[in-house]
Each structure stands twice: as C-alpha cells, then as structure tokens.
C-alpha cells in the first residue's frame, strides 16, 4: 500500500485509476531502462515510487493524441 503520494493527489493529475496505473507502470519501466529522473529528491527507494511521485508533482503526463 502506498502512503505517499496519496491516491487522491495522484487522481488530480489523471482521469482514472486505470490511466494512473498505466502511466506509472510505463514511467517506472522507462526509469528501469535508464531514463533520467525528473525530481531532485524522492521519498521512495523504488522506481515505481519515483514514478508515482513524479506524477503527483505534475512532471509526467499522459500524451493526448
């Protein structure tokens, strides 16, 4: 269970829980592959936590087609 960032904070950045999970998984995969981190400080030690923190900060968005 995640404590930070809260699901409510995350859902302010995306339309649905499904979109949130897909965006977080994609960003975590990108971080695993060596993409640069977008924040200077992270509370979580894992890439999925980094992805969620970046989403909450508004640094990662879903690309609209």
Swiss-Prot record:
InterPro entries attached to this UniProt entry: DNA-dir_RNA_pol_omega, Pol_omega/Rpo6/RPB6, RPB6/omega-like_sf
An annotated GO cellular component: DNA-directed RNA polymerase complex
EC number(s) on file: 2.7.7.6
A GO molecular function held by the record: DNA binding
GO terms (BP aspect): DNA-templated transcription
SMART domains: RNA_pol_Rpb6 (SM01409)
Catalysed reaction equations from the record: RNA(n) + a ribonucleoside 5'-triphosphate = RNA(n+1) + diphosphate
A Pfam family matched in the record: RNA_pol_Rpb6
Keywords: DNA-directed RNA polymerase, Nucleotidyltransferase, Transcription, Transferase
Superkingdom assignment: Bacteria
Name of the top EC class for this enzyme: transferase
NCBIfam families: rpoZ (TIGR00690)
Quaternary context: The RNAP catalytic core consists of 2 alpha, 1 beta, 1 beta' and 1 omega subunit. When a sigma factor is associated with the core the holoenzyme is formed, which can initiate transcription.
Function recorded in the entry: Promotes RNA polymerase assembly. Latches the N- and C-terminal regions of the beta' subunit thereby facilitating its interaction with the beta and alpha subunits.
Membership in a protein family: Belongs to the RNA polymerase subunit omega family.
Name of the protein this chain belongs to: DNA-directed RNA polymerase subunit omega
Organism: Ligilactobacillus salivarius (strain UCC118) (Lactobacillus salivarius)
């Amino acid at each position: 269970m995640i404590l930070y960032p809260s699901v409510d904070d995350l859902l302010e950045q995306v339309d649905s829980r499904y979109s949130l999970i897909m965006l977080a998984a994609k960003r975590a995969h990108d971080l695993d592959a060596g993409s640069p981190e977008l924040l200077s400080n992270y509370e979580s030690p894992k890439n999925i936590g980094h992805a969620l923190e970046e989403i909450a900060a508004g640094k990662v968005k879903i690309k609209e087609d």
